[in-house]
């Protein structure tokens, strides 16, 4: 098929998770349920943090931002997939695909940055408790979040502008249920060397550096706890870090699983199936991890729900 520049009328074909017609209603019901649970759970976290003065601290400020990003992240892919299943159409427009790639990179990158910032917050709280309020002041907290958005915005924009220069064949098939950046580059007809370089740099920035920051923070935390004589103090410190460690392990564990799945099997079907874990399961489980393991969040949610019940 002759390669041509895609226009706004051109489209890609997202092959999805399965071609079996009997599975489509099951997939629709499953993913709709997961989407609603994710949005509701993360909205409750945001409402609990914003409405309860006890949670107006740096840790919960970052948590509410993480919940907002998770809602945006899952909303980038799932609604389109649900519409496609219901309409029995695999089409996605060229601009729709680029928009999906842009926001996927942005929100996935923000997840990594926020997890690193939250690890730094725990490091300051445990290793420098007397200076915590001075170091983690509202100005610094806001600056950390804004700087993360700024960096992610420009990296995502550069990647999309470079992708717009590529040529594709009309009706190109993408073996995924969303426009995953690497899969889109694989089906391009023109040279993608520069795009791959930018993608690798972005992966290093969004993956390696945040992970290094998280590892450094927790190495300092462990070192500080080793010198702590109070068992109660150690337990309290571990309990404040437990939820964050679970979320970090889930996020990077599922991401690594997707990478290994695609590297070992070379199967697009298994890769897209594994992608469900980090694209949908991780954002869905985050609110449960933080609410079930955190007494402050559980208390705030109970007060929020009791106020809602008391309203006429």
Curated annotation (Swiss-Prot):
Domain of life of the native organism: Eukaryota
CDD domains: 7tmA_OR7-like (cd15234)
Gene Ontology molecular function, alphabetical: G protein-coupled receptor activity; olfactory receptor activity
Pfam families noted in UniProt: 7tm_4
Cytoplasmic compartment segments: 47-54, 121-139, 218-237, 293-312
Spans traversing the lipid bilayer: 26-46, 55-75, 100-120, 140-160, 198-217, 238-258, 272-292
Location in the cell: Cell membrane
Residues in compartment: Extracellular: 1-25, 76-99, 161-197, 259-271
Tissue-wise expression: Nasal olfactory epithelium.
Cystine bridges: 97-189
Membrane topology: Multi-pass membrane protein
Annotated keywords: Cell membrane, Disulfide bond, G-protein coupled receptor, Glycoprotein, Membrane, Olfaction, Receptor, Sensory transduction, Transducer, Transmembrane, Transmembrane helix
Positions annotated as glycosylated: 5
GO CC annotation terms, alphabetical: plasma membrane
SUPFAM superfamilies for this protein: Family A G protein-coupled receptor-like
Biological processes annotated in GO: signal transduction
Primary location group: membrane
Family: Belongs to the G-protein coupled receptor 1 family.
Record function comment: Odorant receptor. Selectively activated by androstenone and the related odorous steroid androstadienone.
Protein name according to UniProt: Olfactory receptor 7D4
Gene name per UniProt: OR7D4
């Amino acid at each position: 098929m002759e390669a041509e520049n895609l226009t706004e009328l051109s489209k890609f074909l997202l092959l999805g998770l399965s071609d079996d017609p009997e599975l489509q209603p099951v997939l629709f019901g499953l993913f709709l349920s997961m989407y609603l649970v994710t949005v509701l759970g993360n909205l409750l976290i945001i409402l609990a943090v914003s409405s309860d003065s006890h949670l107006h601290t740096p840790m919960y400020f970052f948590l509410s931002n993480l919940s907002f990003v998770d809602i945006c992240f899952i909303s980038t892919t799932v609604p389109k997939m649900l519409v496609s299943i219901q309409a029995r159409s695999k089409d996605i427009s060229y601009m729709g695909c680029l928009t999906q790639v842009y926001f996927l990179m942005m929100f996935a990158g923000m997840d990594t940055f926020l997890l690193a910032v939250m690890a730094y917050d725990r490091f300051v709280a445990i290793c420098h408790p007397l200076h915590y309020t001075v170091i983690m002041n509202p100005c610094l907290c806001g600056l950390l979040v804004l700087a993360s958005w700024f960096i992610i915005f420009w990296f995502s924009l550069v990647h999309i502008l470079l992708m717009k220069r590529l040529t594709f064949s009309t009706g190109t098939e993408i073996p995924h249920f969303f426009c995953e950046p690497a899969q889109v580059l694989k089906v391009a007809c023109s040279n993608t060397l520069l795009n791959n370089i930018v993608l690798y740099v972005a992966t290093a920035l969004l993956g390696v550096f945040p992970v290094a920051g998280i590892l450094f923070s927790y190495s300092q935390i462990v070192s500080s706890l080793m010198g702590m004589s109070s068992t109660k103090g150690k337990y309290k410190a571990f309990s404040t870090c437990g939820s964050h460690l679970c979320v970090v392990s889930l996020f990077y564990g599922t991401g690594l699983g997707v990478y290994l799945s695609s590297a070992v099997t070379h199967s697009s079907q298994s890769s897209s199936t594994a992608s469900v874990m980090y694209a949908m399961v991780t954002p869905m489980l985050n609110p449960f991890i933080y609410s079930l393991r955190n007494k402050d969040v559980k208390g705030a949610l109970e007060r929020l729900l009791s106020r809602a019940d008391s309203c006429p």
